[in-house]
Amino acid sequence: MSAGQRPAPKFPLRLDQVKPAGRSGAAPLLRPQRPLHQAATERGRGTTPAGLGLDSHLVRERMLARLQAEGVRDARVLAAMRAVPRHSFVDTALANQAYEDTSLPIGLGQTISKPSVVARMIELMLALQPAGARPRLLEIGSGCGYQAAVLAQLARQVVSIERLRPLYDKARENLAPLNFGNLRLVYGDGRIGHAPNAPYDGIIAAAGGEDIPQPWIDQLGPGGRLVAPMLDARSGGQVLVVIDRHADGNLVRSLHEAVRFVPLKSGTD
């Protein structure tokens, strides 16, 4: 350890060991593997829901314009979200709200995250990846499968874990028409990650607890980045925590903005 360096805190990581950090820079465009919006239209769950307008792609473009206005700059993320039909991942009764910047219920007390939160977290996770990279990614909390579909546009391989069996089944149903060959859904305990496919270049979590589980740290590869919500005991709310593993194995942690996610739980139901 060089002079002036402070020793890295031990895990489980807590927020009193983390200092704030600013937003990361953008990266150039990485085009999707296939025109997913066409596949979803041709092979998905029917026609555009009533009320979305003559073309849901126009509604999607307005969503992307809002994301850009709010500071999302990574063209890879915007292209991936352009390709994924969010209305196909929510209940028909809520489809008219699919492209609003709001979270929506998906059952069992769970929600699909706001588009701005999805974009921000993925942008943070990919900030260390060079242009043209196809990283290996781990998602904790598949939910309805929407974020997994966005990640599959960007990655060489995505492993997505869901602990609630009905949601796991729903995600499989939602994703099946899109026919991703690089996406694996796993029914299991997200707190333990998925060691068989580790190490990962990026790990992203859609649930937050009081600490960052040690298995996630262990499964993060050199040059990788983990982005997850975590409880801030001082405020009682959640904030985004980013953990980078440098090529030499050292970990660097930073604290970002306040968020609101469902609690991170162990086991399966």
Swiss-Prot record:
Reaction(s) catalysed (UniProt annotation): [protein]-L-isoaspartate + S-adenosyl-L-methionine = [protein]-L-isoaspartate alpha-methyl ester + S-adenosyl-L-homocysteine
GO biological process: methylation; protein modification process; protein repair
Chief subcellular location: cytoplasm
Region (Disordered): 1-53
Compartments where located: Cytoplasm
Entry-linked Pfam families: PCMT (PF01135)
GO molecular function: protein-L-isoaspartate (D-aspartate) O-methyltransferase activity
The protein's enzyme class: transferase
InterPro entries: PCMT, SAM-dependent_MTases_sf
EC nos: 2.1.1.77
Location of the active site: S113
SUPFAM superfamilies in the record: S-adenosyl-L-methionine-dependent methyltransferases
Keyword line: Cytoplasm, Methyltransferase, S-adenosyl-L-methionine, Transferase
GO CC, one annotated term: cytoplasm
Keyword presence, Nucleotide-binding: no
The UniProt record lists the keyword Cytoplasm: yes
Entry's family note: Belongs to the methyltransferase superfamily. L-isoaspartyl/D-aspartyl protein methyltransferase family.
Primary role: Catalyzes the methyl esterification of L-isoaspartyl residues in peptides and proteins that result from spontaneous decomposition of normal L-aspartyl and L-asparaginyl residues. It plays a role in the repair and/or degradation of damaged proteins.
The protein's name: Protein-L-isoaspartate O-methyltransferase
Organism: Methylibium petroleiphilum (strain ATCC BAA-1232 / LMG 22953 / PM1)
